[in-house]
């Protein structure tokens, strides 16, 4: 069960794309922005800034759904959730580029990129992995660390849900009991 997650507050996003840059850097072989630019296979971001309502920037990333439609649609079983805290990750060695996961994802966050290291040099599915390697090292996800506006934060799921419930109650009734 996920206890902490990257919370997206699109109203605070300014579209600077620092989250995308830091995500790609965190998934590069060198883990260094300047060295990553020169790598033979360029790292790809797992978060993307799209256009949301009213033509405003919207940070879009995997929600690590439970149950996950992408995982259920993946015929070779390349999407698994046995990594820390139920994060859904793609086993790139098993991905056959059938596209089923991408079609099943309700948030359109699974992208396909060419990978010369994959068998036959084919394309593979890439999606947010929750920066599980950074979490294991005691760090927060790269996108949340990079975001200076607070549009992406790494927070306790239960606390965020309570804040949302309280905000709705205030809007509807004007008061909230503690």
Say what each PLM segment does.
Residues 1-178:
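Non-ligating segments of multi-cofactor redox enzymes
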């Amino acid at each position: 069960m996920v206890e902490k997650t990257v919370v997206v507050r699109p109203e605070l996003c300014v579209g600077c794309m620092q989250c995308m840059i830091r995500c790609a850097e965190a998934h590069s072989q060198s883990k260094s922005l300047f060295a990553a630019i020169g790598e033979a296979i360029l790292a790809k971001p797992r978060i993307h800034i799209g256009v949301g309502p009213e033509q405003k920037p919207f940070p879009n990333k995997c929600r690590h759904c439970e149950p996950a439609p992408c995982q259920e649609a993946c015929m070779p079983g390349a999407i698994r959730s046995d990594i820390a805290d139920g994060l859904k990750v793609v086993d790139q060695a098993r991905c056959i580029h059938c596209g089923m996961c991408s079609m099943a994802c309700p948030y359109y966050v699974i992208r396909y990129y060419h990978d010369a290291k994959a068998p036959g040099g084919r394309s593979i599915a890439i999606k947010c992995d929750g920066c599980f390697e950074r979490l294991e090292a005691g760090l927060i996800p790269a996108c949340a660390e990079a975001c200076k506006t607070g549009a992406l934060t790494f927070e306790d799921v239960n606390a965020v849900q309570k804040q949302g419930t309280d905000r709705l109650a205030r809007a509807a009734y004007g008061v909230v009991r503690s």
